Amino acid sequence: MKNLTKREEELMKLFWEKGALFVKEIIDLLDEPKPHFNTISTIVRGLETKGYVAHEAFGNTHRYYAAVSEAEYGKQSLGSVVSRYFGSSYLNAVSSLVKEEKISLDELKELIELVEKQK
């Protein structure tokens, strides 16, 4: 799966939270200043090309919906970050969190318990 831009992620969050949407509904949900219809339509079609959304036709218009779950995207994104910044090592990623004090001892214990349960 290809990585998403910030704007694409913003639109995907709308699909994950609200379900199927028409482009007009997407625009209504966005903050001011509202982007032009064609801009959002182009971004949504790009998401469809990338496989993140699909559509159902209603006459001349389309209602779009997420074809990839938020959890699935999160896993893919995490894998990409670990690969790109930590040499594909989840140990290096977690070690970085520990060194930066971004993860607590209790959270580490939970991780260990999860790993032990997987065995």
Where are these regions (language model features)?
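Short acidic, hydrophobic short linear motifs in intrinsically disordered regions
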Residues: 20-30
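Short, hydrophobic-biased segments on the C-terminal half of alpha helices
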Residues: 41-45
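Short, locally clustered residues in the helix-turn-helix/winged-helix DNA-binding domain
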Residues: 13-19, 98
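Pre-recognition alpha-helix immediately N-terminal to the DNA-recognition helix
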Residues: 9-14, 25
